[in-house]
């Protein structure tokens, strides 16, 4: 079976991505088994769609470094126009290559970066779940959409979130997971959050975040700005 360890097909990991039956918050034995199988696939050669899909899978497995490696591989220029299972990459016009051309890798790449920065399945917003801390030490993202009809902006430095802004558009429950967030969040009424378990917090101590209500966390995990 060793010859299949790095095979591009990964349908046995559908429960990890795009579905969410397998997660770190669920059965940890199953999660670790999925992670082990995924890492055995490696970060090397593959088709465009497979490279894009593995970025998303590694994001769900919280493997930021492997996401980074796969992104670099997916953005490697290729000139092949023949069917080639080892020539995934991009053409000069930034179209994804299987090879030949397919759009799956382009969509998978962008979806994967979003998954690295924000995940919102299983009833919570997970902030920077797969940040490649040695490479993406500083950055910002605006306008990410989360399940529950939230809009999220994140700014980070030294590989730690500095500011998190969340806007609710539907008045649904808002639960955020990020180490240190419990002490640093204010809602529009300047009230602190109530900590549930030190990592997952009901923002503002409320069961639901009212429509249009904004939450702001400054200096997350450090000093409040």
Region locations from a protein language model:
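Extended glycan-interaction surfaces of carbohydrate-active proteins
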Residues: 1-48, 71-91
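Aromatic- and histidine-enriched alpha-helix N-cap/loop-to-helix transition segments
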Residues: 9-14, 45-52, 62, 101-108
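Well-ordered alpha-helical scaffold segments within catalytic/enzyme domains
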Residues: 14-26, 40, 53-62, 112-121
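Non-catalytic C-terminal accessory modules of carbohydrate-active enzymes
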Residues: 65-198, 204-210, 214-224
């Amino acid at each position: 079976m060793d010859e299949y360890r790095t095979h591009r097909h990964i349908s046995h990991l559908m429960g990890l991505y795009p579905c969410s039956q397998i997660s770190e918050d669920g059965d940890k034995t199953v999660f670790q088994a999925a992670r082990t199988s995924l890492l055995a696939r490696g970060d090397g050669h593959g088709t465009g769609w497979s490279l894009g899909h593995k970025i998303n899978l590694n994001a769900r497995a919280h493997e930021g470094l492997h996401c980074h490696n796969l992104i670099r591989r997916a953005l490697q220029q290729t000139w092949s126009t023949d069917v080639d299972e080892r020539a995934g990459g991009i053409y000069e016009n930034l179209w994804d290559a299987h090879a030949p051309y397919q759009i799956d890798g382009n969509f998978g790449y962008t979806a994967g970066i979003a998954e690295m920065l924000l995940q919102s399945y299983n009833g919570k917003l997970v902030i920077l779940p797969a940040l490649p801390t040695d490479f993406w030490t500083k950055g910002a993202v605006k306008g990410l959409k989360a399940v529950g009809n939230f809009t999220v902006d994140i700014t980070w430095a030294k590989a730690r979130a500095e500011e998190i802004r969340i806007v609710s558009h539907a008045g649904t429950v808002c639960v955020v997971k990020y180490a240190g967030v419990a002490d640093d969040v204010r809602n529009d009424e300047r009230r602190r959050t109530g900590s549930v378990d030190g990592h997952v917090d009901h923002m503002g101590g409320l069961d639901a975040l009212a429509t249009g209500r904004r939450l702001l966390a400054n200096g997350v995990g450090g000093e409040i700005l």
